[in-house]
Amino acid sequence: MRSDAVKKGVERAPHRSLLYALGLTDEELKRPIIGVANSKNEIIPGHIHLDKIAEAVKAGIRMAGGTPVEFSTIGVCDGIAMGHGGMKYSLGSREVIADSIEIMAMAHGFDGIVLIPNCDKIVPGMLMAAARLDIPAIVVSGGPMLAGICDGTTCDLSTVFEAVGALKAGKITEEEFYSIERNACPTCGSCSGMFTANTMNCLTEALGLGLPGNGTIPAVYSERIRLAKEAGMKIVELVERNITPSQILTKEAFVNAFSLDMALGGSTNTVLHLKAIAHEAGVDIPLEEINDISDRVPNLCKLSPAGKYHIEDLHFAGGVSAVLKELSKAGLLHLDALTVTGRTLGENIKDAKVRNRDVIRTIEDPYSKTGGIAILFGNIAREGAVVKASAVSPEMLRHEGPARVFDSEEEAIEAIYGGKIQKGDVVVIRYEGPKGGPGMREMLSPTSALAGMGLDKDVALITDGRFSGATRGASIGHVSPEAMEGGEIAIIEDGDIIEIDIPARKINVKLSDEEIKKRMANWKRPEPKIKKGYMARYTREVTSGSKGAVFREGGV
């Protein structure tokens, strides 16, 4: 066993002495040592209950003959970090999470590891760690929050963000506003729409590192506890069979994950995160290939923010397995891909059934014949930009309008709430990329402001930053190269005409090549916004959003 390095032989007597100090017995030391990475904390609603999940995981490990050892890692609540300087630290936390798990697993010789995430950056951070470590690993998430009920209809966190704009526009009363605030998030769990956290938890099933049900079983259901026990039991089997992430995270597994992403209409952040996980696994997924997947995989689900349904509705409709089963009918999946069940993806989904055809459409009658995410290219996005096409109003799929340029999210929000943005405009928010932000902040506040004020069907927003999975509208992010790296988004001026054609996968500023070159020659790189601490180091080492915003090779 791998853990023999810390527990076997005369030379390891000091190590055993320390293990005895934990209360471990000789029998427990004979068994596989399984790390349990728990991101429980008391600031994220999606993580407040993870101690219960961890206890269930450890019970499962013990039942199967393993010895669990729990440790913690950090987690940021993107909703609480949103709209202020705290969001600069969210994406960077992904790297810290991956690094911290690597450190713990390597320092203590774990035979296998169970990863317990739930929210936005914690899920990909843990998946990156699994790929990097390549020891038997399984992910069991905390599960989604139930949807709220606001004035008789379902609501969620995106409803609250949009309510801010609606209140400022006089569309709702203060009483209605505060009722939404208090009722939108009724339970623990990851926010209830097909936002980043839930998208990634669902994709974990398609990648093969999560058990069926991982993406959709609600956080407050006893079924989630049973799933955690099963994950604990399964990791011991994976150790015994030496099934590791490198056998699971193949090119085919990532194609399966992106295919599910398109069918679900998932968050644009998945492009960033799946590319980062693939990087750790040594798998190359060019952005152009993601467009190819989108062209052939239909959008089968309209979940919040694109529609009225929530993750609990997807669960009752058959869950991720039912969506995958529907895709398999058209030969859109690699069904022979290995998973942590020890079986193939095809074997996992063979008995799945769709129980609600409005939540999960048939392959013959999709919401859209193409996938929910598109990669755009053009003279302001030579390395690509990302849009959640499934959440864009039909009238905004093609749009041309004058640029309204802002060098920070705060400037843009002030202009939107100040009534300075008109129908037809294209809001450009730059110097918010991985290096420029730094940290590639999510622009949920400005997009929600536009939606709440009724402008989401008339105004587009482009940025080298990111968008929350709760964003809807013509919101085009991850523009690469970013402004801080001399990307052409840096030289756009107020009034320049921006041309967006999502079906054709194009985004351009209507300027001649000569004018662009002239402006670029006069451009000067601004000073970094943060000059000390972790984000200063992050700024130096992070790569382009088009590469997943991973650290450069040989970096930190």
UniProtKB/Swiss-Prot annotation:
Q: Which GO terms describe its biological process?
A: isoleucine biosynthetic process; L-valine biosynthetic process
Q: Where is the active site?
A: 468
Q: Which residues participate in [2Fe-2S] cluster binding?
A: 119, 191
Task: Tell me which UniProt keywords the record has, alphabetically.
Answer: 2Fe-2S, Amino-acid biosynthesis, Branched-chain amino acid biosynthesis, Iron, Iron-sulfur, Lyase, Magnesium, Metal-binding
- Can you quote the record's cofactor note? Binds 1 [2Fe-2S] cluster per subunit. This cluster acts as a Lewis acid cofactor.
Q: Which PROSITE patterns match?
A: ILVD_EDD_1 (PS00886), ILVD_EDD_2 (PS00887)
From the UniProt annotation, give the residues forming the signal peptide. none
> What enzyme class is recorded for this protein?
lyase
Specify whether Magnesium is a keyword of the entry: yes
Q: What cofactor does this chain's UniProt record say it requires?
A: [2Fe-2S] cluster; Mg(2+)
GO cellular component terms, semicolon-separated: cytosol
The catalysed reaction is: (2R)-2,3-dihydroxy-3-methylbutanoate = 3-methyl-2-oxobutanoate + H2O; (2R,3R)-2,3-dihydroxy-3-methylpentanoate = (S)-3-methyl-2-oxopentanoate + H2O
| Annotated function | Functions in the biosynthesis of branched-chain amino acids. Catalyzes the dehydration of (2R,3R)-2,3-dihydroxy-3-methylpentanoate (2,3-dihydroxy-3-methylvalerate) into 2-oxo-3-methylpentanoate (2-oxo-3-methylvalerate) and of (2R)-2,3-dihydroxy-3-methylbutanoate (2,3-dihydroxyisovalerate) into 2-oxo-3-methylbutanoate (2-oxoisovalerate), the penultimate precursor to L-isoleucine and L-valine, respectively.
Q: How does it assemble?
A: Homodimer.
Query: What is the protein name for this chain?
Result: Dihydroxy-acid dehydratase
Organism expressing this protein natively: Caldanaerobacter subterraneus subsp. tengcongensis (strain DSM 15242 / JCM 11007 / NBRC 100824 / MB4) (Thermoanaerobacter tengcongensis)
Its taxonomic placement starts with:
Bacteria, Bacillati, Bacillota, Clostridia, Thermoanaerobacterales
